[in-house]
């Protein structure tokens, strides 16, 4: 899938997330949590990368994080670089969907115990609620963009 096909696919994914409010409320925990500051509304424009963050062989840059105009859909985009041999991120699941676009190197996307190989130019997706992680599967750094779309996380 190239970037044009990916951008054509993104509106369908965004539309699908509007069907999630019942699922989102069912997945929320009863444990009280800290109140988060409201996220800004995302508007059309260009978003340059923010400052580098990370450690232990993994670095990243956030491009944007906020709410789409519909008001109930959160979107976030960042770029991650993993050095060879870096332990994968913690296995997790979320209320949102995650889409990866591999820029360079070889990554492994594991969802619900199934591992799939991704190379530069590939797109991977993890649907809301699936257990997942991404790991560097090569002997050179892997770099990928991540777009998350879905209801706000509690």
Roles of regions detected by a PLM:
Residues 2-5, 13-74, 83, 154:
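A short, N-terminal "cap"/entry segment at the start of jelly-roll beta-barrel domains
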Residues 87-89, 108, 124, 128-134:
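Histidine-centered metal-chelating micro-motifs
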Residues 77-81, 99, 123-125, 146:
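Conserved hydrophobic/aromatic beta-strand scaffold that supports enzyme active sites
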